[in-house]
């Protein structure tokens, strides 16, 4: 391969560079086998059986022919440079094989071989060498330790799973990207049973080069794929992952992610409350919320959401109307809809009256129960459903007709009634819950209905379609490069931290650090009582733990006594701490205590946290997360999303808090964290007091942790 061609491949868009790997015109198989049951033989057998039209080039020094194809003794003897090369040789031979492929001009390699980073340091070093060789020649490399990739639209199977013995993927427009090859094969089998077409799959293995993000990105940019299912155990390359999610949002293509595993952020964050609340799993959820990605809780949910997403109807302002022949099913669906946050508003009063006039013993509220009488007169189904669309205005409709919906006596006629309404309102999402097999379901499938036996699973999937719709309607906000804000060389004390935050628009109540009791009295007299007294020391982060905070100090004598008490407590309980004096601050009266903070996630950078203070944050962990930076409207959405939000909005006769000021403060904090760069480890504002509307929101306590630098260097 020429140096110029190699550079062209490297400079190509990251996702497009996977095309030779997923849509190859020729495939070499290094370590090819005549035995179609062996790892080096299965891909050849699968491609021959399923009509791969490109060239298959087996390489084996001991065979002149493999499975009816001419074989080559070495990579150097290949008659052409393959688009893709399957590497199925022992681990010690992989490096030289990849180098030989590079010299031959191969554009990509799929390394089945194991024995690399998954087995320890020696394997990791060998893997690094393999990747370096691939990059030297501009090759993309899948694996090592990868099950491979397939594109059944081409009959291409660089995939050694036995699952293909049970059948190839059905035609369709759902792609699979998975870090686990075996689990990806399991998804393939489940999709076949669900009659869900998954023609393209990439299993990334060790992700030495090609990542999960690369694979998702290629799939969402493919004109042959509308929906992506992804399975992840960890996010190994955040840049490619986020680039893929941005591509999915631009393309209007849903990504459903099944991310497993739980872990903590790391010991460096132990300084603040923030550290015990944040975790990379919660942070990931917050990041996914910025994009058109839904996280599935189970494999079944992954399948359900992907299946319904293939209808490509993503309602904005989603609401659910249900027509049913079972009042019990209506109750069950209503419960689940409330649990997942899918609105089921009642039908308008006038529409209810018209439906009652048509069938006096019907329940026309929502769910609309047309009773078993509908089986005698199918025009009831038509009229009731039409009213739900036109009068009720529901964006999504769920029809529950159980086994009656596929009965030989009425199934086809019922499907026809629904088909007419669906065709008259193509922008609405229609789902049918019936039981049946094969031909019994055909009238509904031919009309394009999504079918669910379990209506509760349908509700979860319908709710997901609305979340996709809202995400696609919301423009992505691009983040400019971070950095530029100067931080102190080491973790500052509270007063300095507050001064730094104040310059970013994060205000505190009037306060000062004083060196004597009389100075403290003079300042307190000036700002008015009551006041708060705190030890001022960068070495004592959580002062209340040693009795270093005094509240409700109400006169000059109390200030003098409190000043001396704090100094004694510091000497007794923190004798090594460096004291700057005592901080005197105005004590805010009333309001709602809140918590907000920043934690630097090792993958996604600064993440903001918000919740109510006290028991809400410490015990209930009613906290929301969002990746920084964000605007005021997004901050207000965070505030509204916590379970305790009614306390801020005037619940039980309380005065409404100044939520607008609280949102501005939270947004300012997010921008501060973004501009501060990588040296900012965490910020802990606890409490923040949100005073009644129009009176502002103020940071009462502030802990700011920075990564120390030598010789006073600044960021």
Where are these regions (language model features)?
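Catalytic-core regions of core metabolic enzymes
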Residues: 1-715
């Amino acid at each position: 391969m020429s140096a110029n061609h190699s550079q062209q491949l490297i400079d190509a868009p990251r996702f497009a560079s996977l095309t030779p790997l997923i849509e190859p015109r020729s495939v070499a198989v290094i370590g090819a086998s005549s035995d179609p049951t062996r790892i080096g033989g299965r891909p050849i057998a699968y491609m021959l059986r399923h009509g791969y039209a490109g060239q298959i080039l087996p390489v084996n020094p001991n065979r002149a022919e493999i499975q009816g194809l001419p074989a080559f003794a070495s990579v150097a003897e290949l008659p052409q440079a393959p688009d893709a090369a399957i590497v199925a040789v022992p681990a010690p031979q992989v490096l030289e094989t990849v180098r030989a492929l590079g010299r031959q001009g191969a554009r990509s390699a799929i390394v089945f071989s194991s024995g690399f980073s998954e087995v320890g340091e020696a394997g990791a070093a060998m893997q690094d060498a393999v990747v370096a060789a691939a990059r030297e020649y501009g090759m993309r490399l899948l694996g090592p330790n990868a099950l491979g990739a397939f594109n059944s639209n081409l009959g291409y199977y660089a995939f050694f799973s036995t699952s293909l013995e049970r059948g190839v993927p059905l035609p369709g427009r759902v792609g699979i990207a998975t870090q686990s090859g075996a689990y990806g094969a399991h998804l393939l089998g489940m999709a076949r049973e669900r009659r869900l077409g998954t023609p393209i799959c990439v299993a990334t293995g060790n992700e030495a080069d090609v990542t999960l993000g690369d694979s998702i990105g290629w799939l969402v940019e493919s004109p042959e794929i509308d929906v992506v299912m992804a399975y992840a155990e960890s996010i190994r390359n955040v840049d490619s992952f986020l680039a893929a999610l941005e591509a999915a949002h631009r393309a209007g293509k849903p990504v459903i992610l099944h991310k497993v595993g739980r872990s903590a952020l790391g010991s460096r964050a132990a300084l603040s409350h923030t550290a015990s609340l944040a975790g990379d799993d919660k942070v990931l959820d917050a990041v996914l919320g910025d994009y058109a990605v839904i996280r599935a809780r189970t494999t079944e949910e992954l399948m359900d959401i992907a299946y319904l997403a293939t209808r490509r109807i993503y309602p904005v302002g989603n609401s659910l109307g249900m027509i049913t022949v079972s009042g019990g099913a209506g109750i069950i669906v209503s419960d689940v809809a409330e649990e997942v946050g899918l609105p089921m508003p009642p039908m308008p009063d006038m529409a209810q009256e018209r439906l009652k006039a048509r069938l006096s013993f019907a329940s026309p509220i929502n769910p609309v129960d047309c009773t078993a009488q509908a089986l005698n007169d199918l025009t009831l189904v038509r009229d009731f459903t039409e009213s739900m669309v036109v009068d009720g205005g529901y964006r999504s409709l769920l029809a529950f007709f159980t086994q009656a919906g596929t009965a030989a006596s009425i199934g086809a006629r019922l499907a026809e009634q629904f088909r007419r309404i669906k065709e008259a309102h193509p922008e609405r999402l229609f789902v049918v819950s019936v039981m049946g097999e094969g031909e019994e379901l055909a009238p509904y499938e031919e009309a394009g209905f999504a079918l669910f036996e379990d209506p509760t699973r349908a509700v979860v999937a319908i709710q997901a379609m609305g979340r996709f719709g809202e995400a696609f309607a919301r423009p992505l906000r691009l983040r400019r490069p971070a950095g530029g804000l100067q931080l102190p060389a080491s973790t500052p004390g509270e007063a300095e931290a507050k001064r730094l935050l104040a310059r970013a628009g994060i205000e505190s109540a009037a306060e000062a650090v004083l060196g004597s009791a009389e100075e403290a009295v003079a300042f307190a007299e000036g700002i008015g009582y009551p006041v708060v007294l705190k030890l001022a020391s960068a070495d004592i982060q959580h002062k209340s733990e040693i009795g270093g905070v005094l509240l409700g100090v109400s006169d000059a004598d109390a200030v003098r006594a409190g000043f001396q008490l704090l100094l004694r407590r510091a000497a007794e309980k923190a004798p090594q701490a460096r004291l700057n004096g005592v901080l005197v601050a105005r004590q805010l009266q009333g309001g709602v205590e809140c918590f907000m903070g920043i934690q630097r996630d090792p993958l996604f950078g600064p993440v903001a946290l918000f919740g109510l203070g006290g028991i809400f944050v410490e015990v209930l962990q009613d906290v929301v997360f969002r990746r920084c930076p964000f605007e005021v409207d997004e901050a207000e959405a965070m505030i509204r999303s916590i379970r305790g939000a009614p306390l801020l909005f005037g619940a039980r006769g309380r005065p409404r808090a100044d939520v607008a000021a609280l949102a501005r403060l939270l947004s300012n904090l997010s921008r501060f964290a973004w501009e501060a760069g990588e040296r900012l480890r965490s910020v802990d504002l606890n409490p923040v007091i949100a005073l009644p509307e129009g009176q502002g929101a103020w940071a009462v306590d502030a802990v700011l942790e920075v990564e120390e630098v030598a010789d006073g260097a600044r960021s």
